Amino acid sequence: MKTTAAAFAFSLLFAGFGAALPAQADSLAYGPDTCRNGFVWREAAIHDHVCVRPSSRTVAAQENAMALSRIDPAGDYGPFTCIDGFVWREAFPGDAVCVTPDRRSIVRTENANARRTRVLG
């Protein structure tokens, strides 16, 4: 009897938590990655959901399109070596698209501000 009562209580507790979590996520249009008004996903890669101004997403797309023209495959880092005047963007771990140092600084600031540009449910 005690085991049955404990199992019933546990199932109620578990069911309560299960019901509360999806309700919170469902209230956000894009789940936990929903951006505040005026912001969009940067999409430096398909999984990059840092919320930025639309102009920054446009710049990231342009950087991706020009990526091959900014590398020196014979450099110290092989196919990931940037030509002079460019550095890795580092929008996310493994992002080796070459950009200007100023642009990398902007991307780092965007990453640091990620919680402020996202709707917190």
Residue ranges and their predicted role:
Residues 1-8:
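Bacterial N-terminal signal peptides that target proteins for export
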Residues 14-23:
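C-terminal segment of classical bacterial N-terminal signal peptides
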Residues 26-121:
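Post-signal/leader-peptide non-cytosolic segments of secretory proteins
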